[in-house]
Amino acid sequence: MSRYRGPRFKKIRRLGALPGLTSKRPRAGSDLRNQSRSGKKSQYRIRLEEKQKLRFHYGLTERQLLKYVRIAGKAKGSTGQVLLQLLEMRLDNILFRLGMALTIPQARQLVNHGHILVNGRIVDIPSYRCKPRDIITVKDEQNSRTLVQNLLDSSAPEELPNHLTLHTFQYEGLVNQIIDRKCVGLKINELLVVEYYSRQT
């Protein structure tokens, strides 16, 4: 299944706010109206919607998300929390959380076009897994820095999560540590996502 490229507002009206997909928000009460029209949701549908929320927020294909779930399932600790850590530490998401891009698809484009360096080397793989002490910088070229500066100026001021530091004037971000669960930028019940996949096998 390919990455979603359809109408974004349609998705947030059904699933709620997806800041990684779009900065738009559903109108207040739209969730309740949708729920009343569709009647009581089945447990399967609730799990499916949480999975879809995760997939659309981080801009993943079904195959990519399944791969992350399997990796998380083999790691120590809570599968759901490890899954969120894996997704949050992707380079495209780190750029988004730093405010260097307004959405994750926009961050993915920055990476694909070679504007971003990790520890002094160009990385053009959006799924690159960042680690503590990684230094993310914008390429020292005028078009790269002008592009990111415009995005920084356009992004709404938000408090950075504690696992990241941003040095705006140096066009540099630092990964301080693995993200804490409470700093994840999406309202999600990750256990329902894990349950969804465990019932598919």
From Swiss-Prot:
Compartments, as annotated in UniProt: Plastid, Chloroplast
GO cellular component, one term: chloroplast
UniProt keyword list: Chloroplast, Plastid, Ribonucleoprotein, Ribosomal protein, RNA-binding, rRNA-binding
Domain S4 RNA-binding residues, every copy: 89-152
GO terms, biological process: ribosomal small subunit biogenesis; translation
Keyword Ribosomal protein appears in the UniProt entry: yes
UniProt cross-references to NCBIfam families, sorted A to Z: PRK05327.1, rpsD_bact
PANTHER family: 30S 40S RIBOSOMAL PROTEIN, SMALL RIBOSOMAL SUBUNIT PROTEIN US4M
Function text: One of the primary rRNA binding proteins, it binds directly to 16S rRNA where it nucleates assembly of the body of the 30S subunit.
Subunit structure, as described in the record: Part of the 30S ribosomal subunit. Contacts protein S5. The interaction surface between S4 and S5 is involved in control of translational fidelity.
Protein name as catalogued: Small ribosomal subunit protein uS4c
Organism from which the protein derives: Arabis hirsuta (Hairy rock-cress)
Primary gene name: rps4
